[in-house]
C-alpha cells in the first residue's frame, strides 16, 4: 500500500469536498439502453472438472493463491473492533482454508453428491467472482474503488477500500470477502470508519490486459476453464449446452451466468441441470429463501435479479451522503497522484 498521511488525506478531502459533494448531489445511476460490450468472457465446464481429487489442493486453487500471494492482506496484530460492535472479520489465522471464499482464497471447488435417475453422481464446481456485466458492487461502492475494465474483469483497489462491505451486501452471490486490520481506514479513522478491505477474484486482469490466460485456466489439467473472446466464448458455451442437454434428455437449465444478475462474463455449463445442482447445494448447507447462502459460499439460484439497477433509491442513499462525496473526491485525487499501481 502506498504510504498515506492522515493529515494529507484530510487536506485532499477538504480540496475535493466542494466539487465532489455538488457532483454527487447531481449524479444519478445511469440507465443505459444499450448493453456494454466487453472483450473477454470465460467458460467453466462442470462436466470436465474432477476437483483434482488426488491432490490436497486443486490446481486452479493453488495457482490462484500463488499468483495473488503478493496481493493478500497482512493485517496488524492488534485489530480494532468495528465500532460500535465488538467484532471484526479476521481470516489471517485461517489462510489455508480452501473450502470457501476468503480474503486469502479467491476461488474454491464446491463438491456435491447428487441423486439422479442414473444413480448417485459426484460433481465439482469451481466458484469465484462472476464478473457481472452490470456489477452491483461497482454501483454501490461509495468510494469508487471498484472498476470494470474492457475485458470485463471487475477489480477492487484494496489500497483505498474502507472495508464497509456494501459490495458484499449487494452482490447476489456475496463474493467479496473482508479482512480487518488492513487498509486506508487504519490511517484515517481506525475507530470510526470502515472495517478493513475487501478482496476477491479479479480475473487476473493484469494477464488479460497482456492477452495472457489467467492462472486458473493455465493450471487446469482437464481444460475445465476457458477464457477467450466474448462472442466466441458465448457461442462455444451454447454449443456445449446443447450437447449436454441432448445427452441428459432431461428438462432443465444447462447454462448459468448468461442471464443471472443481468448477465455476466462467466458462463457455467453442466451435464446436469442447474435446478438439480441448486437443490443439492441448498440441502448441503441448509440454505433457505430467507438465508439463500452463507458467507463465502455462493448459491446457484437460477433467478438472480440486479436489484441495484431496479432500486435507484438504494444507490442514492449511499452515494449522496456529503461525507461520502468528500471522501470519494479525496480518493479520486489521491489515486490520480498515485497512478495506476498495476501499470508499474
Report residues per predicted region.
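Non-ligating segments of multi-cofactor redox enzymes
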Residues: 1-344
Amino acid at each position: 500500500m502506498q504510504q498515506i498521511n492522515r493529515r494529507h488525506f484530510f487536506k485532499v478531502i477538504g480540496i475535493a469536498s466542494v466539487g465532489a459533494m455538488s457532483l454527487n448531489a447531481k449524479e444519478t445511476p445511469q440507465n443505459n439502453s444499450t448493453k456494454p460490450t466487453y472483450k473477454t468472457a470465460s467458460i467453466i465446464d462442470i462436466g470436465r472438472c474432477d476437483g483434482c481429487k488426488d491432490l490436497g489442493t486443486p490446481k486452479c486453487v493453488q495457482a490462484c493463491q500463488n499468483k495473488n500471494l503478493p496481493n493478500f492482506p497482512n493485517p496488524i496484530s492488534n485489530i480494532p473492533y468495528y465500532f460500535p460492535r465488538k467484532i471484526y472479520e479476521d481470516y489471517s489465522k485461517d489462510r489455508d482454508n480452501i473450502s470457501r471464499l476468503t480474503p486469502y482464497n479467491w476461488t474454491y471447488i464446491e463438491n456435491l453428491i447428487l441423486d439422479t435417475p442414473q444413480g448417485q453422481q459426484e460433481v465439482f464446481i469451481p466458484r469465484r467472482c462472476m464478473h457481472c456485466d452490470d456489477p452491483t458492487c461497482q454501483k454501490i461502492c461509495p468510494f469508487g474503488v471498484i472498476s470494470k475494465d474492457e475485458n470485463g474483469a471487475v477489480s477492487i483497489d484494496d489500497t483505498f477500500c474502507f472495508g464497509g462491505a456494501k459490495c458484499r451486501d449487494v452482490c447476489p452471490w456475496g463474493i467479496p470477502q473482508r479482512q480487518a486490520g488492513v487498509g486506508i481506514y487504519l490511517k484515517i479513522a481506525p475507530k470510526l470508519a470502515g472495517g478493513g478491505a475487501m478482496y476477491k477474484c479479479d480475473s487476473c486482469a493484469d494477464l488479460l490486459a497482456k492477452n495472457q490466460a489467467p492462472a486458473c485456466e493455465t493450471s487446469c489439467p482437464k481444460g475445465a476453464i476457458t477464457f477467450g473472446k466474448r462472442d466466441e466464448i458465448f457461442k462455444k458455451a451454447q454449443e456445449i449446452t446443447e450437447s449436454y442437454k441432448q445427452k441428459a434428455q432431461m428438462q432443465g437449465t444447462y447454462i448459468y451466468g448468461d442471464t443471472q444478475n443481468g448477465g455476466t462474463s462467466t458462463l457455467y455449463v453442466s451435464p446436469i441441470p442447474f435446478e438439480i445442482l441448486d437443490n443439492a447445494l441448498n440441502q448441503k448447507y441448509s440454505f433457505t429463501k430467507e438465508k439463500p447462502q452463507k458467507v463465502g459460499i455462493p448459491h446457484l439460484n437460477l433467478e438472480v435479479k440486479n436489484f441495484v439497477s431496479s432500486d435507484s433509491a438504494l444507490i442514492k442513499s449511499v452515494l449522496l451522503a456529503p461525507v461520502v462525496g468528500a471522501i470519494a473526491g479525496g480518493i479520486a485525487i489521491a489515486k490520480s497522484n498515485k497512478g495506476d499501481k498495476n501499470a508499474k
